Amino acid sequence: MIFMPNWLNDAVFYEIYPQSFCDTNGDGIGDIEGIISKLDYVKSLGCNAIWLNPIYDSPFMDAGYDVRNYKKVAERYGTNDDLVRLFDEAHKKGIKILLDLVPGHTSDQHEWFLEAKKAAKSEYSNRYIFTKSVWDAPPQYRMMCGLCERDGNYMVNYFSSQPALNYGFHEITHPEWQLPCDHPDCLATAEAMKDVMRFWLDKGADGFRVDMADSLVKNDDNKIATAKIWRGVRDMLDTEYPNAAMVAEWCNPERAINNAGFHMDFYLDHYGNGYSRLFRYGEFGDQAVFNPNGKGDIKAVSYTHLRAHETGR
């Protein structure tokens, strides 16, 4: 197994949130043309790689992390041809582009889900996780009830508009609707995501930062089965796209790199929202610093924010 693409060894990333980065057509929303216009600026900062937040077609119920079409650029940002031009212009300046891959769920407007929620059986009936009956909604899972033509509730990963894709269950606790990871329909989900990756790599993308990379297989506490899926993806990259990078949002480098085969893990410190801790922090009662009763506790803020290395002194 190749350790990592050479360019990743000295990559300095600049994150771009497309909708607020640079608007060139006056509609109040950033666009691909705006990103292209700022490539020299990005390079002037010493950055030689860009992590581009989701740019796919989406109803934007979750900032683009609810994908309606993985193979189409959202019209608010431009076209597929515009994105290819961004790849080309960035490469001319020695800048790599990582797209944000969202493999754990889609929008509830994705064509796969529109087919899956029908009563009639199709190749997409098991693309998402449905129970057998609308009366079956185990409390340990996030389920949306009574919204589909078919009899059953569907699992979501986060918001109600983000149905979870079905990569199977490592531990089967409800055999009437939970599929094992080696079920053909679960394997088909993984292959569909590989197909998405190939689509953009063939157009010039340099790899992917993977959103919620550890969320694929359910009832997989040690992430053994999830890691196996990513090993398969890594094998595909090493064989077909050896210069492409695979970067995880996992926050566990041991599992992400050593077990799952990612080249790198974005390690995020989930300290919460500093503003909330000032005004409405309530993990153990009202401990906000500015508690209206004068009983605020500054420790939560001072421990995690005031001592941070980037805090001005």
What is each PLM-predicted segment?
Residues 183-196, 296-302:
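A Trp-anchored, charged/polar loop motif used as the substrate-binding/catalytic surface
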